[in-house]
Swiss-Prot record:
Assembly and binders: Oligomerizes as a right-handed, spiral filament on DNA at oriC.
Species whose genome carries this gene: Prochlorococcus marinus (strain MIT 9215)
Name of the protein: Chromosomal replication initiator protein DnaA
Gene name of this polypeptide: dnaA
Gene Ontology MF term list: ATP binding; ATP hydrolysis activity; DNA replication origin binding; lipid binding
GO CC term, one of those recorded: cytoplasm
Domain I, interacts with DnaA modulators: annotated segments: 1-79
Length: 464
């Protein structure tokens, strides 16, 4: 199949001149040419979401541009890459497209929000959280596309937009990027970003001071509201009641609602069913931990922003060691730069590796090394460690092994489960969470983990 078509290339060039940069980069550029026969132009979108959005929002625009180039009417149809056979797409070209897409940062052609505009909109937005600073990867492409769609057309299809994902994966960044985008397009837009904790405190304050009218005006008379960490509504009955009516008032007035949580609506506990139902009535988009390629792109972009030159092998080393979230990844980058600056040591893997703690083993280790060291330390056999034994000494050793493997290798949760005798990824996740909790409350566990880390460091440095 021909994947580079001169007509589609010309159409893209034309659209690049007429559409905003974020719109073009997010929707038009990723679309791949499939075929052009008898006036029918077939395009392949990366996923069903993109295909549907293109069909609803850009079909006529593309058809008009194609008609101007071809000199006759052109009908455009869209297919989803996920719904067609893998052999119908040139995979090499598609992979290149995805790699390029990951490293592009999208935003308006204008500059960041100016202090003047911010003074007009006391919205609580962080200047750093804009689309152009967000690195898009397979883990976040859907959430990014949905966020941009809402920023471009608020109060329409995706209302509310519910963004969910673990800590430090970019939920707040995307939420606030929506707010910045709206303020740039319309400086008079009333945008409000607030954490659930702040909303709760405002409600409590309003009750105490008999000022609920002012609180309701504050939250209900906005064009766009961004509510972070909605899971903290759990158990707060009166606050839930107030938020329920606030949600209804905003939705009925056509205001856009964006909500972020560490889990999807159907997994929230201690929250009224009627609220969960409303959270689910729009679009839910999750963000997963970034893959190695995306983590590398994030570090490269951060190095560019900080005007730092880091060796490629060091960037890859950091990207390989910090796998759970972006916050940890960027924190490791900052510590590495600070360490090299203070000590005067060169920016190399050998010099930086030992200080990349506390959540990283700090050296290159293999799954076999982790299992061997944990087995030796706790004096349990390797076979018993990877078995299904629930004896407390074995179970505790296994949990620590899973924790160390998570933070000492770039293996995914399912892969770690495989290393421990085919355990389910949820079992691995639970084990890691248990160790993380105990590290701050149980000195004995903390000491055991640190001693095994030290043993792994000693072994690994022999190979540096």
């Amino acid at each position: 199949m021909q994947t580079i078509n001169p007509i589609w290339a010309e159409v893209q060039q034309s659209l690049q001149k007429t559409l905003s940069k974020p719109s073009f980069e997010t929707w038009i550029r990723p679309a791949k040419f499939n075929c052009f026969e008898n006036g029918l132009l077939t395009l392949i979108a990366p996923n069903t979401f993109s295909s549907d959005w293109l069909r609803k929002n850009y079909c006529q625009t593309i058809e008009k541009a194609a008609k101007e180039i071809c000199g006759h009417d052109v009908k455009v149809v869209f297919k989803s890459e996920t719904n067609i056979s893998s052999d119908s797409i040139n995979k090499e070209n598609l992979d290149e497209q995805i790699v390029n897409h990951k490293t592009k940062l999208f935003h308006n052609n204008n500059q960041d929000i100016s202090p003047k505009n911010r003074s007009k909109n006391p919205n609580g937005l962080n200047l750093r959280y804009v689309f152009k600073r967000f690195v898009v990867g397979p883990n976040s492409r859907l959430a990014h596309a949905a966020a941009l769609a809402v920023a471009e057309s608020p109060g329409r299809e995706f209302n509310p937009l519910f963004i969910c994902g673990g800590v430090g994966l970019g939920k707040t960044h995307l939420m606030q990027a929506i707010g910045h985008y709206r303020v740039e397009i319309d400086p008079e837009a009333k945008v409000k970003y607030v954490s659930t904790e702040t909303f709760t405190n405002d409600v409590i304050s309003g009750i105490r001071r008999d000022g609920m009218t002012a609180i309701r005006d504050k939250y209900r008379k906005v064009d766009l509201i961004l509510i972070d960490d909605i899971q903290f509504l759990e158990g707060k009955e009166y606050t839930q009641e107030e938020f329920f009516h606030t949600f209804n008032a905003l939705h009925e007035s056509g205001s856009q609602i964006v909500i972020a949580s560490d889990r999807p609506p159907n997994q929230l506990s201690g929250i009224q069913e009627r609220l969960i139902s409303r959270f689910s009535m729009g679009m839910t988009a999750d963000i997963q931990p970034p893959d190695l390629e995306t983590r590398t792109a994030i570090l490269q972009k951060k190095a560019e922003q900080e005007r730092m030159s880091l060796p490629r092998d060091l960037i890859q080393f950091i990207a390989g060691r910090f796998t759970s979230n972006i916050r940890e990844l960027e924190g490791a980058f900052t510590r590495a730069v600070a360490f090299a600056s203070i000590t005067g040591l060169p920016m190399t893997v050998q010099s930086i590796a030992p200080m990349l703690d506390p959540n990283s083993v700090g050296v290159v280790v293999t799954p076999t090394q982790v299992i061997k060291k944990v087995s030796d330390f706790f004096k349990v056999s390797t076979d018993e460690l990877i078995s299904s034994s629930r004896r407390k000494p074995v179970s505790q050793a296994r949990q620590i092994g899973m924790y160390l493997m998570r933070h000492g290798t770039d293996l995914s949760l399912p892969r770690i489960g495989d290393e421990f005798g085919g355990k389910d990824h949820t079992t691995v996740m639970y084990a890691i969470e248990q160790v993380e909790k105990k590290l701050s409350t149980d000195p004995n566990i903390a000491s055991q983990v640190q001693k095994i880390r030290d043993l792994l460091q000693i072994d690994s440095r022999k190979n540096l």
